[in-house]
Amino acid sequence: PATPDVCTVSILTGGTQIPGSYHLLSVTVNKELNRIPSATLYFYDGEASRSTFEISNSETFIPGKEIEILLGYRSQNDTVFKGVIVSHSVRVRRNSSNLIVECRDKAIGMTLGRKNKYFADQKDSEIMEQIIGNNGLQKEVEATTTDLKEVVQFDSSDWDFLLCRA
């Protein structure tokens, strides 16, 4: 049987740890095959009756800012998510108000816009490295052996095209 232990969480935005005064209610990290990883953070934030929302009004969770979530035991934390903040919203209930922070992996940029490209005399691995590199992401692509005479990316996002080729 597992022994009980103290779970710890650390959240960095823009490389800076968030203040300890922020009351984190929950963290959800989703990593699924063929999907963009995501994370959702819930914080207790402010009082609706006074219209004060300390965390939401701060610059800690501005959309577009980089975020890193680390989880572990007894402050021995490991990174479980790195990405960007895509939205934050306040949900007001009768008894409390919560700040909801939605995050996505940086690969979310590959889903924006449909593109048309022509690749000639390249391997699938070379095409993938080129597309991933053009999006400013780190890449680790296993080399393929077959040279393809021509490959066309027609009216599809880089993400969808890579999923079809992988």
Predicted regions and their residues:
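Juxtamembrane "anchor/assembly" segments of surface/extracellular structural proteins
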Residues: 1-66, 102-110, 126, 142-144
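A broad structural signal for short, well-ordered beta-strand segments within beta-sheet-rich domains
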Residues: 21-26, 85-87, 148-149
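Edge/loop elements at the starts and ends of beta-strands within beta-rich repeat scaffolds
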Residues: 32-35, 76, 94-96, 137
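Catalytic cores of large soluble enzymes that bind and process phosphate-bearing ligands
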Residues: 33, 59-61, 73, 77, ...
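Short beta-strand and beta-hairpin "edge-sheet" elements
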Residues: 73-103
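Charged- and aromatic-enriched interaction segments used to assemble
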Residues: 95-166
